[in-house]
């Protein structure tokens, strides 16, 4: 029986023992040594604040933040609205992986923000029409949704750049059908049509020198007579002053010359043809200028479900 008090004391001592100390947060110098896609949200928030404080030029900040993600693994169709909406379980942000749209949106949102909380708000302001979160208000269509609803951020200058060499294509968008078939969501939208200008691939070299860090790139593809924006990314300036394409594509985020990108696409086209598959061909590019003196508009109130 004398063992009982001893055992009781041991149990009490175990319950009252001090937990091990939490690991010390990294210094900003240590955080700066990590690629962005390996940072925790807390570290990313401190990195965002550091960039806002130490790089006042928005264009240079966009280029630096985008390059901080070089090597980030690529995953297609990465984000959704979970847990705000439960039509799928895809999250509303991702630091570890990206696709082309996710990479561009996260880079812009981080460059425009001072901390993690503002980044998350800014990301939704960019991803959704008027910043109202929902699968029906997400900017699904690059030309008619993303480019238009983010006119406060970027302006399409494709026709201006191309001049007499400008090309265009008609685009018809049926959002109701898209939401019903792709997201099992019923929503009523009118069918919309537009005429989209772009720079043909044969004339891209002639306009590259007019582009700046942070400008938005839409890659225009064609197949079976239809044209659409199949890929997006950012313009960055190389050390020699030439313009490169910073983008997320399998297997990872990379910075490459536009010549290298077009060669990579041409190789894919040749492979598709050799395999007897319908060939998705590169037609050209749309270029959207990052606006000067950006004023971020407020988001509309989130409606009650």
Language-model segments: what does each one mean?
Residues 37, 41, 55-63, 90-101, ...:
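Solvent-exposed, acidic/flexible segments
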Residues 72-194, 212, 219, 241, ...:
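Acidic/His-rich structured neighborhood in mature extracellular/periplasmic domains
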Residues 13-14:
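C-terminal motif of bacterial Sec signal peptides marking the signal peptidase cleavage site
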């Amino acid at each position: 029986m004398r063992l009982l008090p001893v055992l009781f004391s041991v149990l009490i001592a175990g319950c009252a023992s001090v937990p091990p100390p939490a690991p010390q947060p990294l210094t900003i110098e240590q955080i700066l040594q990590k690629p962005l896609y390996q940072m925790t949200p807390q570290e990313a928030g401190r990195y965002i604040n550091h960039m806002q404080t130490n790089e006042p030029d928005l264009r240079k900040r966009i280029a630096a933040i985008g390059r901080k993600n070089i090597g980030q693994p690529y995953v297609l169709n990465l984000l959704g609205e979970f847990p705000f909406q439960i039509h799928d379980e895809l999250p509303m942000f991702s630091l570890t992986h990206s696709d082309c749209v996710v990479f561009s949106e996260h880079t812009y949102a981080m460059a425009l923000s001072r901390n993690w909380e503002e980044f998350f708000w800014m990301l939704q302001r960019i991803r959704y029409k008027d910043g109202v979160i929902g699968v029906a208000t997400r900017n699904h269509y690059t030309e008619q949704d993303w480019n238009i609803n983010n006119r406060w951020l970027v302006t399409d200058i494709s026709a201006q750049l191309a001049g007499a060499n400008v090309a265009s294509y008609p685009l018809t968008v049926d959002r109701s059908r898209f939401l019903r078939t792709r997201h099992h969501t019923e929503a009523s939208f009118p069918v919309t049509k537009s005429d989209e200008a772009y720079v043909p691939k044969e004339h891209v070299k002639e306009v590259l020198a007019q582009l700046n860090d942070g400008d938005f790139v839409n890659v225009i593809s064609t197949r079976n007579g239809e044209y659409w924006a199949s890929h997006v990314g950012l313009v960055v300036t190389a050390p020699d002053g030439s313009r490169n394409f910073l983008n997320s594509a399998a297997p990872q985020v990379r910075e490459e010359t536009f010549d290298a990108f077009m060669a990579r696409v041409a190789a894919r086209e040749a492979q598709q043809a050799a395999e007897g598959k319908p060939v998705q061909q590169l037609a050209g590019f749309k270029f959207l200028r990052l606006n000067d003196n950006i004023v971020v508009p407020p988001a509309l109130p989130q409606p009650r479900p």
